Amino acid sequence: MSVHINAEKGQIADTVLLPGDPLRAKFIAETYLENVECYNEVRGMYGFTGTYNGKKVSVQGTGMGVPSISIYVNELIQSYDVQNLIRVGSCGAIRNDVKVRDVILAMTSSTDSQMNRVAFGSVDYAPCADFELLNKAYQEAQKNNLPVAVGSVFTADQFYNEDSQIEKLARYGVLGVEMETTALYTLAAKYGKKALSILTVSDHVLTGEETTAEERQTTFHDMIKLALHTVS
């Protein structure tokens, strides 16, 4: 067991999907997996293990933001030797060529978090996705006629931020804004593990367009199926 996860060794699979919302973790496990077992309820941050197409897969809620996901990724790797970590979450689009309901494969991530400045000092470390997972996800999307955008995302340290650089980031090719990918990719690199963020565009920062609950659910289904096909 670790501080925030009370699973026994062997209860967590080598591959873990990481939604931010613990209730979304519960939904994923109950909807997509078979032979489901709940291994964690500490602080209400649910974790489940089941099988998908015969492959053992876990789903662990992470909470929101760099500090929260860092806790769970550290513990999953250090205490349970997880090898593959796939974030499945939402983001806000910041470019006109990225539409609401699109799915983004995050190739790399920039951030205003101080996480890597603390670790690397004056060096601007650029964390990126594992190429094998990224390529597999892209190929699966192509095979299933699922449109995806591949590129950079921005991991914001604040959800409400009046002093943002959104327009400049968009000019530099950043596709969307979220709150966790930089931490995931950095920690995966630190420990020699594989990581990928697959994101559903739930709203558009520039136009104000948002998805309805029903539309989010449909696109969310595409994202989860893509993640599961990538690792199965």
From Swiss-Prot:
UniProt name for this protein: Purine nucleoside phosphorylase DeoD-type
Source taxon at top rank: Bacteria
GO MF, any single term: purine-nucleoside phosphorylase activity
Function: Catalyzes the reversible phosphorolytic breakdown of the N-glycosidic bond in the beta-(deoxy)ribonucleoside molecules, with the formation of the corresponding free purine bases and pentose-1-phosphate.
EC number in record: 2.4.2.1
The UniProt record lists the keyword Hydrolase: no
Keywords on record: Glycosyltransferase, Transferase
PROSITE patterns in the cross-refs: PNP_UDP_1
Residues binding phosphate: 20, 24, 43, 87-90
UniProt record similarity statement: Belongs to the PNP/UDP phosphorylase family.
GO biological process, one term: purine nucleoside catabolic process
Binding site residues for a purine D-ribonucleoside: 4, 162, 178-180, 202-203
Keyword Lipid biosynthesis found: no
Site positions per UniProt: Important for catalytic activity: 216
Catalytic activity: a purine D-ribonucleoside + phosphate = a purine nucleobase + alpha-D-ribose 1-phosphate; a purine 2'-deoxy-D-ribonucleoside + phosphate = a purine nucleobase + 2-deoxy-alpha-D-ribose 1-phosphate
Active site (record annotation): 203
Pfam families: PNP_UDP_1
Subunit-level organization: Homohexamer; trimer of homodimers.
Annotated GO CC locations: cytosol
Enzyme class: transferase
InterPro entries, A to Z: DeoD-type, Nucleoside_phosphorylase_CS, Nucleoside_phosphorylase_d, Nucleoside_phosphorylase_sf
